[in-house]
Amino acid sequence: MASSVTACQGASPYQPRNYQLEMLEASMKENIIVAMDTGSGKTHIAVLRIKAELDICPPDKLVWFLAPTVALCIQQHEVIASNLPAVRTRTLTGLDKVELWTEQSIWDAVLNGYRVIVSTHAVLADALSHGFVKMSRLALLIFDEAHHCTRRHAANKIMRDFYHPTLTKSGPGAVPRIMGLTASPVVRSNHQELLTVESNLDAVCRTPRVHRQELVKFTHRPHLQQIWYTPTDPAGFKSASQTLGALYHAWETLDIGDDPYIQRLRKSPLDDTALKKALLTGKTYCREQLRRFVDRSRHIFEELGEWAAEYYIYASIKQLGDRVRNSYMSGDWDEAEKAYLVDFLSKIPASEIQLALNDPGSFRISPKFESLLNFLDSLDEREFSGLIFVKQRATVSAMTSLLSVHPCTRERFRCAAYVGWSNGSASKDILGDLLNMQLQRDTLDDFRSGRKNLIIATDVLEEGIDISACSVVVCYDKPPNLKSFVQRRGRARRKQSTFAIMFPTDDASADVSKWQDLEQAMIEAYQDDERQLQSVSALESLDEEVMERLTVESTSAVLTADMAMAHLHHFCAVLPPQPYADMRPVFSFETNEDGLLKGTVILPSCVHPKVRRTEGRRWWRTERAAMKETAFQAYKALYEFGLVNDHLLPLTKRPELKSHDLGAMPSILETSEQYDPWIEWAYSWSSPDIHQSRIVVRMNEGRGDELCMRLMGPTYLPPLSPMTLFWNNSTTFTVTFEAAERVPLVPLSSVEDMRAITALYLKATNSRVCSSERDFTALFAPDLHHTELKGWLNAYEGCDPAMEVYSRGHNPLLMGVVRDHSRYGEPFLFRKWLVSDQNPSCSVVELECAPFPHRRNLLHRQRLANSQVDVDEETPESAAKNPIVAADACTIDRLPFTMAIFGLFISAIVERLETELIATRLRETILRDVGFKSTDHIITAISTPFAHALTNYQRYEFLGDSILKFSVSCQLFFQHPNWHEGYLSEGRAMIVQNPRLAKAALDTGLDAYIVTKRIASRKWSAPLISEKLERVPAKRQMSTKVLADVVEALIGAAYMDGGHATAQACIRRLLPEINLHAVDTRTATRSVAPESARHMMNERLKDHIGYTFEDESLLVEALTHPSCDYDSTTQSYQRLEYLGDAVLDMVIVSAIFNHPIQRPQGDMTKIKHAVVNANLLAFLCMESATSEEKLDVAQTSKDSFAVTTSQESVELWRFMRYRGQNLNAARDASLARHRALRDEIASSLLHAPHYPWHALSRLNADKFFSDIVESVLGAIFVDSGGDLAPCEVFVERIGLMAYLRRILDQEIDVRHPRSVAQQLAKTNIQFVLQRVPNEEGGASYQCSVRIEQAELFVVTGCLTAEEAEVTAAVEAIKFLTRDEGSTPLNTS
């Protein structure tokens, strides 16, 4: 059947090696046979070659990978599919019954949509011979175990019958490129055959030439050991084993005339010829079954001994009986043949074998097997992993059983059998084949994982099959040829491993050096380095002087060739570290006709493509000199490209990234005093240009009478927005201001009257003794003409004794404020008169009053029983009993309280006017070029939280922070196309850090306009002209953070006022170095994508993203992981990921901020952090998939097939371009956790009232999953010319916006479990993390939870520190809420 595996299980750690890149480059220039030792990474070179070919070939071309066995096809397909997850690949083997596909339509359907096919040689040879596949459709042919391409092998048939004729007829453009892979190009110990293999494959044999030392470093040759044994007498079996002797006697005396086949032929006169042939040859189906069974039994006796032979005979007879009883057999075998075989074997005295024997002497074994046991017993390895090669399949099953039960081995070895997937003649055998093919499916995985540590196998495991490096390999029989010797030895590739060969004591050809000598002769045929090793060593000892020199005039810094290597390595060492990527420079060399060398160096993929690859300029005799000169040229190019400063050092943590020297800025700074607009008003009264505004006060939104007043000032009055004042929980006052108008010719007397009226209002509502000064800067009066003010003042100024008011029968609704002089004039509100008639001659008059309201800050709603009541506010005594006061001790103000109440509003109005004047001044001075339409947003941005104003900057600071980060990121990205992500991140950090923003506030004078004064305090007093004229300028203390916050808040305010354009103008005013308008987003330097990018980045991906790129190189770059070192023309995605991170922040923050439900800054910050959480982005990346149709072939009857269709999901992560088995393993581990947690996380995102912190922490996805989302987002932003709209579409497409809307609409709880636990504990709760190393060199994490230094519990066995902390917090929540009905956080 076809294999469609997408993950390579148990992949061993793998890192890019120079010699593999060398072989890749060689294969791109010509057809080659890669000849390297087993385990040195030939398959990974093939994977790189496939990637490169898919990048350049048309999309209708195929890459065809050929392997000699089905098992090897399955394994190699797993490796290819794991490394090319976005490419559709499949296997075609006999398991698919390919030999029955006899129609072109079937082949067309099978190959439709696939780019890489893995098959045996015979499958492709047959397909080519029948014309189902054309040679012209193949782009690349890869021959694994290429030494098979000789004589009549199917591999050679492909080349001889199809490749070479097509090449001769149509030229090289009509045939595929060729790559061969082999560890032993000479099969039969004849090194001359190398030339034949090269000719047949139209390729030249290559081993890594320059990097031979690296190849040796990674390839471990085992210790070679001989195991001698005394051979068994072949004729001794008759007397040694009763069961085997009886079987052999029964076979020798078998009468062919009793065979059912012979009897059937005798009954039919038409079958006379067949009868004569059968009698002459003695071959019938039953006799062949018995003959092979007897031969195998004898072989097992000779190889393993009597016990194994008897076990094999007994187990085979039992198996046959079970099959007959279960109707297992089918086909042409009739009932008579069944009965005949069963009857024959029933006469053999085979008794049941005892397996649980403790005495080694009970196991009658052969001298050969005893030698093997002695050898195995001599091994002293804690981590044993071994492989035993035997000749026959029957020996595999018998030896596996014997080793599994023998007392000397059963406790030490965990054995498994492996014979591959091609049944061969065993498919016709129903007797003596004890191996269950299904049981070996997991054998290799079990061996890799350590569940099995010893495999007994036939030669199927010689070639190609990827098994873990073994510490011991035993050849139970001599290798038949040099190829087997090399291949088997290559399996023992652990350090200090052993390769053992068993020899009989009478073998004259046991000289192991025979194979070693032949192998050395073969190597010398294609490896110049080995033949010329001494001359090369002599050359390298030469002292070649490299005279290159670079001097920087401005600093006198000098770079010489001798220093260049150290400088270049240092430059790479300080690049942003990346897991799975080698950050070292990679050197390679080319040789000219004179044997001279020229170097090339390739830097890590985060470096810009223009300077990533540098070639030397001269030819040298030694590698050392070539490396020096190449390193010099590379570092010189980095300097000229702006990645190294004038001191010839990398820019990281250097002044080049610091636009301002901030030094060590303290956290608290001395700043200008808050700008006081009343000072200017005080001076303006000397020659006033009087303006006034009509004020209308309405109670409860207009239900009731209006109170109309006037506000007068000596200069222009800015427009004031309506104000809502909260009297109590049921009463509000709305204060509106009409447009101010200029009032000419106001007499001085009228101004004085207004001063007196203002003082009257302020005194009427104040229990404190008021100042006698009346030179107020802002004046208030009733809405009367100025000529009427004197009469009004005479009517309402002063007070009357309460008894006098009582005697006049004054209207209670027009009563003024009651003042009790027995209590030092304490004010009360009149309720009613109380008259006592107990003494008729002298009635007692009293007043029932209400307490005078203490609240002064009417801008905020009254907060009853709230622990957060302001310190200067008291909870009203509305529930207290109304006080009774004596009338003769009281006076009552003439100004009715219905009018006097306005005095309580004056402080709020004056404070509001003051803030408006500050904002207006700021708008007209520092921010005059920004283009604010009004001051409303400015007021919010400059009001600090401790001013207790109606609004403060916190929400705008949240918005402005993201806008600033976004703007700075864009500016640096487009302005510095040569900078890698490390420089960009550091440059951004320098600009957006609090000290830089605080300095911007100080440099522009913004600090003076930050409102910190407490609004509407009970100690408030009206500003006076005399005080303001005498005011001495002072300083105030302010934190660096407040200054920075206001800068960010103003940026947010500008965005709210006029969108991105106004925000950019504000940034430009406060931070002159950021001018995004001057940057052309269309001219950013981009990587040069390979021509083939359009083929790899097919329509599936474009549909997936939902955006069509004008410049597809951006998409290629967005999907290029830093480990992708094989493509030096494309930069890794780190720059785009850096930009996409800021774009994502901007998209998310805008959605949060503009939601109808306004949330405080803290809640918005929590939501943002939850939504852009890397694990959530990674989960959505894993979930983001498009569906496409997949064609396949299904068998409908014995000989017919039909095309079937199905849907296949293609996830976004599959398109990432990378290299490395360690990344594969990490990716597959993340995907396995995703499969385990998917339902839980998906359900939480759709239905849970809480954010799935716990499940996401257990997901622990590798960072590259979330990086892909951000890098694609950055690519869309760049390609669209800086348009956020298509970015929002992509964020919507992956499902992030839908979840954000659910969080906002349904108020999902996004608090982190640690925060919830800390709130519940109401005391000091500690989470103590600890890394716990394990024996394998890894580590797990544990977290202990402590309250008041007492340990509650410990969570252990977590994959990461984050998972440990979150799990511990969840358990703490359960503990702290154990007595409650529910918990505040979902702990599932």
UniProtKB/Swiss-Prot annotation:
CC cofactor: Mg(2+); Mn(2+)
Binding site for Mg(2+): 1137, 1267, 1270
Annotated Helicase ATP-binding domain residues: 23-203
Motif placement: DEAH box: 144-147
GO CC terms, sorted: cytoplasm; nucleus
Residue stretches making up the RNase III domain: 919-1059, 1098-1281
Residues the record marks as site: Important for activity: 1263
Pfam families on file: DEAD, Dicer_dimer, Helicase_C, Ribonuclease_3
EC class (word): hydrolase
Keywords, alphabetical: Antiviral defense, Antiviral protein, ATP-binding, Helicase, Hydrolase, Magnesium, Manganese, Metal-binding, Nucleotide-binding, Repeat, RNA-binding
Residue span(s) of domain Helicase C-terminal: 371-537
InterPro entries: DEAD/DEAH_box_helicase_dom, Dicer_dimer_sf, Dicer_dimerisation_dom, Helicase_ATP-bd, Helicase_C-like, P-loop_NTPase, RNase_III_dom, RNase_III_sf
EC numbers, comma separated: 3.1.26.-, 3.6.4.-
Molecular function, one GO term: RNA binding
Annotated ranges, domain Dicer dsRNA-binding fold: 564-658
Any Gene Ontology biological process: siRNA processing
Role, per record: Dicer-like endonuclease involved in cleaving double-stranded RNA in the RNA interference (RNAi) pathway. Produces 21 to 25 bp dsRNAs (siRNAs) which target the selective destruction of homologous RNAs leading to sequence-specific suppression of gene expression, called post-transcriptional gene silencing (PTGS). Part of a broad host defense response against viral infection and transposons.
Sequence similarity: Belongs to the helicase family. Dicer subfamily.
Listed name of the protein: Dicer-like protein 2
